[in-house]
């Protein structure tokens, strides 16, 4: 007979801290259901779980309501980027050039 629940992990990293929670969810739970059961939104009130991008082991889940979880999977909640990564790289390179005394 199959277990009535499976164990999964939910992770989120805010600017201040990181949390990894191990959660038992009913077999057949979707990503969206597991996030609700995890209570992670209570620890991070700024999280809007209906709007956050999520993934499993680094792969984005396009439909969290339909994706059924398997035992041992890790749901990752992704934050929005605060700055454009290309612009950050340009600024970093410019600072490095200035430090070495090279023309920009």
Curated annotation (Swiss-Prot):
Protein name stated in the entry: Protein RnfH
Family classification: Belongs to the UPF0125 (RnfH) family.
SUPFAM superfamilies, A to Z: MoaD/ThiS
Highest taxon of source: Bacteria
InterPro entries to which the protein is assigned, alphabetical: Mopterin_synth/thiamin_S_b, RnfH, RnfH_sf
Source organism: Pseudomonas syringae pv. syringae (strain B728a)
Signal peptide span: none
One Pfam family of this chain: Ub-RnfH
Disulfide-bond pairs as recorded: none
């Amino acid at each position: 007979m199959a277990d009535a629940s499976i164990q999964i992990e939910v992770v989120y990293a805010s600017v201040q801290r990181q949390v990894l929670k191990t959660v038992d969810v009913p077999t057949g739970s979707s990503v969206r259901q597991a996030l609700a059961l995890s209570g992670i939104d209570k620890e991070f009130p700024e999280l809007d779980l209906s709007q956050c991008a999520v993934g499993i082991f680094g792969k984005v889940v396009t439909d969290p309501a339909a994706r059924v979880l398997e035992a041992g999977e890790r749901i990752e909640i992704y934050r929005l980027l605060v700055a454009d990564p290309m612009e950050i790289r340009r600024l970093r390179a410019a600072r490095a050039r200035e430090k070495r005394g090279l023309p920009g």
